[in-house]
Amino acid sequence: MTTAAQIPGLDAAPTKHARLLAWVREIAELTQPDRIEWCDGSESEFDRLTSLLIDKGTLVQLDDEKRPNSFYAASDPSDVARVEDRTYICSEKAEDAGPTNNWLDPAEMRTKLGKLFSGCMRGRTMYVVPFCMGPLGSHISALGVEITDSPYVVISMRTMTRMGTPALDQLGDDGFFVPAVHSLGAPLEPGATDVPWPCNSTKYITHFPETREIWSYGSGYGGNALLGKKCYALRIASVMARDQGWLAEHMLILKLTSPAGKVHFIAAAFPSACGKTNLAMLIPTLPGWKAETVGDDIAWMRFGDDGRLYAVNPEAGLFGVAPGTGEETNPNAVKTLWGNAVFTNVARTDDGDVWWEGLTPDKPAHLIDWKGRDWTPDSTEPAAHPNARFTVPASQCPTMAPEWENPAGVPISAILFGGRRATAVPLVTEAPDWQRGVFFGSIVSSETTAAAAGAIGKLRRDPFAMLPFCGYNMADYFAHWLEIGNKADPDKLPRIYYVNWFRKSPEGRYLWPGFGENSRVLAWVASRLDGEAKGTETPLGILPAPGELPTEGLDVSEADLETLLSVDTEVWRQEAELIPEHYNTFGDRLPAQLWAEHEALTKRLNG
């Protein structure tokens, strides 16, 4: 076995951070790489690694006139998405992981990982990737170091985080960092030929909350391998936030400016496929209103000296789902992708560009699909994988707000929760207080089956849109949200809204056009925040009063508007009856306040 001292590169460490150096030495001795590289995040490093990946067959450079400095990658067909069944929260006690997470005894998991990681980087380079989540120098930001044997991960981390020398400088000689180890699990024996996308059929995405560690094995795919994203920014950060009195949330952040120049910053949590990125890059249809982007996926929020919640976007890039992103659905996302992008599992055009379903109304006559096969419009399978991705600097988005990198963060005025609901849930409902808002967040759901008329389809709960991402017991997470409200000045807390863009008629027709028209709902929210709209009380919460939602130029019938802006008490009685089954999942750890909210809702519906 090679000792760490014999591995080239360890002695070239550009840091005196004792804990970091000891950890890198320990992982090097375990994984046995051929060499160690300390990543500086420079352009020359990026150019060298992309050239290496092109030579390996992992990347294909796209036409430089059509997509400057952009690349295409196709993954192994077995490695295309987050692997929730292989994702573990290894807290000291099983009950601290809770019923919504996979748990394994941490000692048992460490034994498994020790065996898997032993020698797993043989024949490969071990890259040490220091990174900052959030703007450099911000008190809301936090640091991490990822060790990986994937140059694809290194170039992606350069886009998604503030990576390299600036992060290492901020770490200093004794700063806190989250250690994150990643391996493809594909050691190369001497003389063996590498494959374009190395991975392993055995996969573990493991988090140790108490020690703030992340270990990921077997996958090269984004969410499993870019450990700053969901693993750190949500799963580990949610535990840090619980312990330190802040919030790490699966939320977009947008800046809304009224025609009068009044600004509000709004955070919003939606499960996947519910329009989060589209709302983050909203183009308002309402004249005079302006929407700008602060973040499209994750928000870290801490209290400022003035008692308000301030948010930063911890990411530096966008890691978006390509299919369905097009000129009609999200033109700002398309404009963002002009260059400096890596596309994974999309299709390639004959002229050196990329394409995916939804990018353009017309399909190209011929493509190379994500599996490398010829594709025509007559092909039976999609040209791009449904979870095909793009990685691109957020700074290229034409709607980025100037405040998006403000180290102080932005003050949040309102928080929206929403799912994909064909029935029951109105277009917008304001919670009269923080506790009701937490109740709304705790019952967020999407319908997975169509409903019969006057009934509710099968629901998939995704509380706070955090179901796959909460790093501890979700009942304790609800309690943490309630505690955040208890210790704050109620007048300075963001107001909470429950929204639903996806209501349908009994015939299955969408009642609300969504997309840019959602600016009308945001305008009503702003008018509530400014004390202008009075709203109307309902058993659920406060809805727009007749005439308050701006409808000029809106192609929605009066009857549909009435459905969208009312609470059907009979349907909501059915809805309320479904909540205990969800709450009982959490046993006696569920906060009593949420049961009280449920009981009060039932009384109001029957009153």
UniProtKB/Swiss-Prot annotation:
Alphabetical list of CDD domains matching this protein: PEPCK_GTP
UniProt keyword terms in alphabetical order: Cytoplasm, Decarboxylase, Gluconeogenesis, GTP-binding, Lyase, Manganese, Metal-binding, Nucleotide-binding
One Pfam family from the record: PEPCK_N
Detail which positions bind GTP.
273-278, 389, 420, 515-518
Extract the InterPro entries matched here. PEP_carboxykin_GTP_CS, PEP_carboxykinase_C, PEP_carboxykinase_GTP, PEP_carboxykinase_GTP_C, PEP_carboxykinase_GTP_N, PEP_carboxykinase_N
| Gene Ontology biological process terms from the UniProt entry | cellular response to glucose stimulus; gluconeogenesis; glycerol biosynthetic process from pyruvate; oxaloacetate metabolic process; propionate catabolic process; response to lipid; response to starvation
One Gene Ontology CC term in the entry? cytosol
Catalyzed chemical reaction(s): oxaloacetate + GTP = phosphoenolpyruvate + GDP + CO2
* Residues that hold substrate according to the record: 82, 221-223, 272, 387-389
The keyword Cell inner membrane is assigned to this record: no
From the Swiss-Prot or TrEMBL record, state where the protein is found.
Cytoplasm
Q: In which pathway does it act?
A: Carbohydrate biosynthesis; gluconeogenesis
Q: Could you say which protein family the record assigns here?
A: Belongs to the phosphoenolpyruvate carboxykinase [GTP] family.
What the entry lists under HAMAP family is as follows: PEPCK_GTP
Subunit structure, per the record?
A: Monomer.
Q: Would you tell me the protein name for this molecule?
A: Phosphoenolpyruvate carboxykinase [GTP]
- Gene label: pckG
